[in-house]
């Protein structure tokens, strides 16, 4: 699945990703890299600004390097989402 296909799918269903607890509206979704299988998937953190129908890609990481965001990372991204929402 190419990144362009991933973007198209997310545009069709921008609330597909799971809401991150205490994340201020940020979401996490898994994206499989081409020819890598499940072990080659990455997690993408994004924010969907409903009023303007804009999706901001905020952060990406491989599951093999990190299981979840730390509390401090969530706090930083929550602050960013708040700023983006107020634009």
Where in the sequence are the language-model features?
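Short, surface-exposed coil-to-beta transition loops
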Residues: 39-44
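Basic, Lys/Arg-enriched alpha-helical interface segments
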Residues: 1-37, 52-54, 62, 67-87
């Amino acid at each position: 699945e190419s990144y362009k296909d991933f973007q198209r799918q997310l545009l069709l269903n921008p609330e597909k990703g799971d809401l991150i607890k205490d994340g201020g509206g940020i979401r996490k979704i898994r994206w499989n890299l081409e020819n890598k299988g499940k072990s080659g998937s990455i997690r993408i953190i994004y924010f969907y600004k409903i009023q303007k129908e804009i999706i901001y890609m905020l952060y990406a990481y491989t599951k093999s390097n990190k299981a979840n965001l730390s509390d401090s990372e969530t706090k930083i991204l929550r602050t960013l989402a708040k700023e983006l929402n107020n634009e």
